[in-house]
Amino acid sequence: MTRYDSLLQALGNTPLVGLQRLSPRWDDGRDGPHVRLWAKLEDRNPTGSIKDRPAVRMIEQAEADGLLRPGATILEPTSGNTGISLAMAARLKGYRLICVMPENTSVERRQLLELYGAQIIFSAAEGGSNTAVATAKELAATNPSWVMLYQYGNPANTDSHYCGTGPELLADLPEITHFVAGLGTTGTLMGTGRFLREHVANVKIVAAEPRYGEGVYALRNMDEGFVPELYDPEILTARYSVGAVDAVRRTRELVHTEGIFAGISTGAVLHAALGVGAGALAAGERADIALVVADAGWKYLSTGAYAGSLDDAETALEGQLWA
C-alpha cells in the first residue's frame, strides 16, 4: 500500500481491469486474434470520479498563476462530478466554492456538494450544462473577484490527462490499439488521446457521444450548439453516437456480467467500445481496447436508472439525463 500526506495526493494510478466476459474474443485462437476490452476504473479516485484529476490540476495551476489566494471564491459550471471534486479540494485548501448546475441533477450530487460546503446556484433544466455554462459566465462578469476555473476551456483539464491518464494507460497496456471515452468537457479524450497518439503508432481514439437530440448524463453531442474550447476534432479517429436507452442497458450489462457498478455515461462508452470491438472481430484484427469508467453508479440511484425494466428506467430518466 502507498502512504500519502494528503488526500489530494491520492488521485490517479487507477486499476485497469480486463473485461473477459464482455470482450468479443479474449484469447487468441484458430478463429482469429484476440479482441479484448479493458476498463480503467476512475471511480477509484478520492471522490469517486475521473474529475478529481482535472479539478485538482486546475486549482493548483490557478494557485501557481497567482489567480487563487487564501480565502478566494471559485465559481464553476458543472453537472455534478467536477463540482464534487472541486468541493473536496476547495474544502481542504480553504476556498469558497460556488457551483452552477442544472436544476434536474440527482439529489445525491446536490447532497454531496452541500456536505462539502459548496454553494449551489441552479440553472434551468432546459439546455442542461450548456445553460449552466451561460449562467456561470454571467455571474463571473458581474463578480470579477470570483475565479472561474472553467473546465471546458482550461488547458489544465487536458494536461491532467496528458500527464496522468495517458501515461498510466501506456504503462499498464503498452499493446493498446484503441482508447474510448465520453465526450463531455472533452478533456479526457483530448489529453489522453494526444499523449497516446504521440507514443503509440496507429492508435485509434474514439469518442462516445449522445445521439443527436438525446441526453446522456455528463456527455454532449458536438452538433448541438456549445462546443468546448478544449475540443480538437483532429485528435479523434471516430465519434460513436449512443442512445440514452442503450447507455442504461449497457450500464446494467456491465454490472451483471463483470460486476462493475458504473455511472450512466460509462454505459455509453461501453456501447461504443463494443461496437469498435465488433468491427475489429469482423476484420480479423487484434484489438486491445481501453475504455474509461468515469464514475460509479452510487450518485444516480435516485434517478431510477437501475431499477425495474428498461422501459421503467427510460420513463424515470426522462428530463434527468443532461450533458
From Swiss-Prot:
Residue numbers of N6-(pyridoxal phosphate)lysine PTMs: K51
GO terms (BP aspect): cysteine biosynthetic process; cysteine biosynthetic process from serine
Phenotype when the gene is knocked out: Strains lacking this gene are shown to be attenuated in macrophages.
Associated pathway: Amino-acid biosynthesis; L-cysteine biosynthesis
Catalytic reaction equation(s): [CysO sulfur-carrier protein]-C-terminal-Gly-aminoethanethioate + O-phospho-L-serine + H(+) = [CysO sulfur-carrier protein]-Gly-NH-CH2-C(O)-S-L-Cys + phosphate
Protein induction: Up-regulated under oxidative stress conditions.
Binding site for substrate: R220
GO cellular component, as recorded: cytoplasm; cytosol; protein-containing complex
Reported impact of R220A: 700-fold decrease in the rate of the first half-reaction using OPS. Affects neither the rate of the first half-reaction using OAS nor the rate of the second half-reaction using sulfide or CysO-COSH
Keywords: Amino-acid biosynthesis, Cysteine biosynthesis, Pyridoxal phosphate, Transferase
Coiled coil location: none
Keyword Amino-acid biosynthesis listed: yes
EC number(s) reported in the record: 2.5.1.113
Needed cofactors: pyridoxal 5'-phosphate
Any GO MF annotation of the entry: pyridoxal phosphate binding
Chain's role: Catalyzes the formation of a covalent CysO-cysteine adduct via a sulfur transfer, using the thiocarboxylated sulfur carrier protein CysO-COSH as sulfur donor and O-phospho-L-serine (OPS) as sulfur acceptor. Can also use sodium sulfide as sulfur donor in vitro, albeit with less efficiency, but not thiosulfate or thio-nitro-benzoate. O-acetylserine (OAS) is a very poor substrate in comparison with OPS. May be of particular importance for cysteine biosynthesis in the persistent phase of M.tuberculosis.
Similarity remark: Belongs to the cysteine synthase/cystathionine beta-synthase family.
Domain characteristics, as noted in the entry: The five C-terminal amino acid residues are inserted into the active site cleft in the closed conformation, protect the aminoacrylate intermediate and are involved in sulfur donor selectivity.
Name this polypeptide is given: O-phosphoserine sulfhydrylase
Name of the gene this protein is made from: cysM
